[in-house]
C-alpha cells in the first residue's frame, strides 16, 4: 500500500468515526408540557417511518397532570431525529405531533 492509499484510508476512517461520535452526542430529549386542562394518561413516540406507536412511555403508574411536564429521551437506537408523538388524555381524546425533529425542537406544549 502506498502513502497516498494509507492517507486516504486514514481520512475515511476519521470521517466515519467522527460521524458516529456526532450521532452519539445528539440531544434527542424533549420536554412534554401538559396544557390540556386534563390529565395525559398515555404517551407514545416512534421514529417517523414506524407504522405503530409502540409501548406507552409513561408506564402503568405515571401520568402527566395538567400544567405538569415530563422529560423524555427519545433516542431508541434510531439515529434519525424524526419522531412522531401521541398523547392520550383520560377522556379518550388524543393529540398528535408528527415529523418532529427532536434534535432541534426540545419542547411540545400539548393543548
How would you describe each model-predicted region?
Residues 9-16:
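Bacterial N-terminal signal peptides
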Residues 80-89:
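A short, solvent-exposed beta-strand micro-motif common in secreted/extracellular proteins
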Residues 38-42:
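Short acidic/proline- and small/hydrophobic-mixed sequence motifs that coincide with surface turns
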Residues 53-77:
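Intrinsically disordered, low-complexity Pro/Gly/Ser/Thr-rich segments with frequent PxxP/GP/PP motifs
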Residues 1-8:
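Bacterial N-terminal signal peptides that target proteins for export
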Residues 19-23:
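Sec/Tat signal peptide C-region and signal peptidase I cleavage site
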Residues 93-111:
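Extracellular beta-sheet/turn segments enriched in Thr/Pro/Gly and aliphatic residues
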Residues 30-37:
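Asparagine-centered strand-capping/turn motif at beta-strand->loop junctions
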Amino acid at each position: 500500500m502506498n502513502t497516498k492509499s494509507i492517507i486516504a484510508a486514514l481520512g475515511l476512517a476519521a470521517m466515519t468515526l467522527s460521524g458516529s461520535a456526532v450521532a452519539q452526542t445528539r440531544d434527542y430529549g424533549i420536554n412534554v408540557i401538559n396544557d390540556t386542562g386534563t390529565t395525559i394518561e398515555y404517551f407514545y413516540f416512534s421514529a417517523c417511518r414506524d407504522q405503530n406507536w409502540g409501548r406507552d412511555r409513561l408506564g402503568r403508574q405515571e401520568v402527566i397532570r395538567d400544567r405538569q411536564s415530563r422529560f423524555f429521551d427519545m433516542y431508541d437506537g434510531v439515529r434519525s431525529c424524526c419522531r412522531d408523538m401521541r398523547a392520550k388524555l383520560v377522556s379518550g381524546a388524543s393529540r398528535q405531533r408528527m415529523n418532529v425533529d427532536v434534535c432541534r425542537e426540545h419542547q411540545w406544549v400539548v393543548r
